[in-house]
Amino acid sequence: MAPRIDHYDWSGGREALLRFGPDTGPVVILVLPLFEEANRTRTFAVGLLRRLAERGIAGLLPDVPGQGESVVPLEDCTRFCMAEVLEALTDRCLDEGRRTYAVGMRSGALLDYCALHSGRWHLAPQDGESLLRDLHRTWRAAGNDGDRQAMMYGADIVEIAGNLLSPNLLTSFSAAAPFDQPGTPRRVVRLSSDPAPADRHVDASPLWRRAEPGDDPALAELLADDIAAWIAACEA
């Protein structure tokens, strides 16, 4: 099932999205990991949403400011503005009478904290500390010297793996954590190699760690079944 190209508006402009599946019923809003991990997982995410569509569940894959095809410069972004656009997209779905479920991958799970979702499903979610640790490791590997504070505050803009990041954006991740509040269903799935607590661990290799973009159709099938069953339980 081929996705349809669409867009959505927010207070700062307009962003692109891919739309999958039916135009009625609950809808999944999938948020990719940030920065380089987005490139490595996008093909997998598209395959996952296609499989959900085959199971009768609609899906949206939005660009957020500074990512994908967005015209907003990444160096002008904060975590809040990324969350704001996802809230705007969620509100549009709610205005259409459709319940929404967030699917966040890795650091994408840090961006859906404003939206009024009926539930959240997270794959290998990162907290802000883990994200900053990964960014600092990449920054050091590029030949830079210094601790995390030097990376975050040593210049007006820091370049990490081709991404131009501001101190404001980096600081906004310092105490960030995936949304987990009473009253909102949340399911966490992690890889078997990840010892962190989860509702389920699955055997697979981490696509986000590969040097080049990749795919894992078997994992996409497994996770589509998991998400579909979880949404059905939430809707019951």
Question: Model segments located where?
Answer:
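Cap/lid segment of the alpha/beta-hydrolase catalytic domain
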Residues: 40, 65-77
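Alpha/beta-hydrolase active-site loop
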Residues: 44, 73-97
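Hydrophobic anchor at the start of a short beta-strand
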Residues: 57-59, 100, 118-120
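Glycine-rich nucleophile elbow surrounding the catalytic serine of serine-hydrolase chemistry
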Residues: 94-116
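The alpha/beta-hydrolase serine catalytic core
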Residues: 116-236
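Short, surface-exposed "cap/lid" segments of acyl-processing enzymes
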Residues: 11-15, 19-63
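Structural motif
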Residues: 33-34, 101-108, 123-127
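A domain-start/cap signature at the N-terminus of enzymes
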Residues: 1-6
